[in-house]
């Protein structure tokens, strides 16, 4: 039981790490969300993104 809980915690930590690296701010300046769609498509493979503080954030 103790080993199972340790493995579960390790799995959760690894999952969080992978998710935070995959999505986030990219080095593209913007003034509107539509400017981020093509850049996010190139970086993450998904066109989902928005302009936040004059920088693109991809999802």
Swiss-Prot record:
Protein family (similarity comment): Belongs to the short scorpion toxin superfamily. Potassium channel inhibitor family. Alpha-KTx 16 subfamily.
GO cellular component: extracellular region
Species this protein is from: Mesobuthus eupeus
Tissue spec. comment: Expressed by the venom gland.
Positions of disulphide bridges: 30-51, 36-56, 40-58
InterPro entries with a match to the protein in the record: Scorpion_toxin-like_sf, Scorpion_toxinS_K_inh
Alphabetized GO MF terms: ion channel inhibitor activity; potassium channel regulator activity; toxin activity
Functional note: Weak inhibitor of voltage-gated potassium channel hKv1.3/KCNA3.
Signal sequence interval, chain numbering: 1-22
Residues annotated as site: Aromatic residue of the functional dyad: 59
Keyword Ribonucleoprotein tagged: no
Name listed for the protein in its UniProt record: Potassium channel toxin alpha-KTx 16.4
Basic residue of the functional dyad (site feature) positions: 50
Subcellular location: Secreted
Pfam family, one: Toxin_2
Keywords: Disulfide bond, Ion channel impairing toxin, Neurotoxin, Potassium channel impairing toxin, Secreted, Signal, Toxin, Voltage-gated potassium channel impairing toxin
Annotated domain remarks: Has the structural arrangement of an alpha-helix connected to a beta-sheet by disulfide bonds (CSalpha/beta).
Location (main, coarse): secreted
Other information: Negative results: does not inhibit large conductance calcium-activated potassium channels (KCa1.1/KCNMA1).
